Curated annotation (Swiss-Prot):
Species lineage: Bacteria, Pseudomonadati, Pseudomonadota, Gammaproteobacteria, Pseudomonadales
Protein name as it appears in the record: D-hydantoinase/dihydropyrimidinase
Gene: dht
CC cofactor: Zn(2+)
Maturation and modification: Carboxylation allows a single lysine to coordinate two zinc ions.
Binding locations of Zn(2+) 1: 59, 61, 150, 316
Organism: Pseudomonas putida
Length: 495
């Protein structure tokens, strides 16, 4: 099975140049001018378009059991929507219940993911601590290719990891060469503020951002960063939404600490006024955590991307329909937290970032694909256009337009946080494993994707929109071999 993309401009995180790209058996076989197609080769005309690495979304929650319900998007529908938006790989989250075996939860999620339309991998959440958890973390790294563990510093009385769990788990991550990640919100403060607001009679969505002010994110980010600094492990902070949290990351990185930050397009574009919409269902549709914030935080986040102190863009794609959101009609703290975004992430970032001059094309590639691949040790197998890399590509039409709407999107949810926004710059074709799965509005994927596992240890040479930062990866990485891969893993980047 072969595919030749002709006449496009190849755009990577470092350079752009005109070239043909030949894909054979799921890999990039050749790059150059005027390539000759092999027999029975599909030819795709890329004239006037950019050929970029397929998007990698490092933060999704498909069919997540959460807050008394289950997210409406399953692994097939969610990854199919991702293909429609140019995303060819996701990293989802295994979230065990407290006291549940990590391995048991991992196999449950892995079973759900078998129907994925594109490639996938997993972070595993640490929701409790014991010697069993420590042992199973080791098995997940050694036998199942897991190389990152998530810690929720929020959601008290549910999945929140207290400081003793953070310390123990970060230490274990260091031993294994895995990357600890955190949802940085002070869960005790959030719980206190929720109860206080409810006692004052504030029950609607407008209370949601008041219960999770930027200070609770800044405090938690600071605490996680200091714990990681003391233990000596890298740290990845998910969905940064506030100036305070960004300041903590910036300060740590200025001292040479390997801390990486993730941002969502919604936090770059939307503000907290959405929670004051007079229509309850509309306001509730925006409820996620951390919440959307006052406009000054958005400008700070753009500066974080431009300075290289924020490194990836994700979606935290976790869909709940209006009927599910209505579970919190009389108590905002019971509104299921989550919004969609996997289909819109890349187009929104291109339109708001590249078209506005805030980001270059190369920075766009880094933020949507390459940096995630580097941090989670999938580079150069993914996030790159080079011979031997996976043929996961997106052919991007810089003049194409799309109006974002729940009426037309492929996400399995009845709400779109970008409703009515028209973007310029969209994927015309999405290619996964060398096959065209999205073509000018036609979703061709009906089969299965495959598991994508990294090697343990944070990669190096991660580039944000600013200068490259070089950080040593844990030595344990070289002793670990991922299993369950579609193809042999490539070594971590050493640029």
């Amino acid at each position: 099975m072969s595919l030749l993309i002709r006449g496009a401009t190849v755009v990577t995180h470092e350079e752009s140049y005109p070239a043909d790209v030949l894909c054979v058996d799921g890999l990039i076989r050749a790059i150059g001018p005027n390539l000759e197609p092999p027999t029975d080769c599909e030819i795709l005309d890329g004239s006037g378009q950019y050929l970029m690495p397929g998007g990698i979304d490092p933060h999704t929650h498909m069919q997540l059991p959460f807050m008394g319900t289950v997210a409406s998007e399953d692994f097939f529908s969610g990854t199919a929507a991702g293909l429609a938006g140019g995303t060819t790989s996701i990293i989802d989250f295994v979230i065990p219940n407290p006291q549940q075996s990590l391995l048991e939860a991992f196999h449950t999620w892995r079973g759900w993911a078998q129907k994925s339309a594109s490639d996938y991998g997993f972070h595993v959440a640490i929701t409790w601590w014991s010697e069993q958890v420590a042992e199973e973390m080791g098995e997940l790294v050694a036998k199942h290719g897991v190389n990152s563990f998530k810690h929720f510093m929020a959601y008290k009385n549910a999945i929140m990891a207290a400081d003793d769990t953070l310390v123990a788990s970060f230490e274990r991550c260091l031993q294994l060469g895995a990357v600890p990640t955190v949802h940085a919100e002070n869960g005790e403060l959030v719980y206190h503020l929720q109860k206080k607001l409810l006692a004052q009679g504030m029950t609607g969505p407008e209370a949601h951002p008041l219960s999770r002010p930027s200070q609770v994110e800044g405090e938690a980010a600071s605490r996680a960063i200091r714990i990681a600094e003391t233990i000596g492990t890298p740290l990845y902070v998910v969905h940064i939404s506030s100036r305070e949290a960004l300041d903590e990351i910036t300060y740590a990185r200025a001292k040479g600490q390997p801390v990486y930050g993730e941002v969502l397009p919604g936090h770059l574009l939307l503000d907290d006024s959405v929670y004051r919409d007079p229509d309850w269902a509309t306001a509730a549709g925006y409820v996620m955590s951390p919440p959307f914030r006052p406009r000054e935080h958005q400008e700070a986040l753009w500066r974080g991307l431009q300075s290289g102190n924020l490194h990836t863009t994700a979606t935290d794609h976790c869909c709940f329909c209006a009927e599910q959101k209505a579970m919190g009609r009389d108590d905002f703290s019971r509104i299921p937290n989550g919004t969609a975004g996997i289909e819109d992430r890349m187009a929104v970032l291109w339109d708001a970032g590249v078209n506005s001059g805030r980001l270059s094309m190369h920075e766009f590639v880094a933020l949507t694909s390459t940096n995630t691949a580097k941090i989670f040790n999938l580079f150069p197998r993914k996030g790159a256009i080079r011979v031997g890399a996976d043929a996961d590509l997106v052919l991007w039409d810089p003049q194409g337009t799309r109006t974002l709407s729940a009426q037309t999107h492929h996400q399995r949810v009845d709400f779109n946080i970008f409703e009515g926004r028209t973007v310029r710059g969209v994927p015309s074709h999405t290619i996964s494993q060398g096959k065209v799965l999205w073509a000018d509005g036609d979703l061709r994927r009906r089969g299965r994707g495959g598991a994508v596992c990294g090697t343990a240890g944070v990669s190096v040479g991660v580039r944000g929109a600013g200068a490259t930062r070089r950080t040593a990866a844990p030595d344990a990485r070289s002793a670990l071999r991922p299993l369950g891969l579609l193809r042999s893993p490539s070594p971590a980047s050493q640029i």
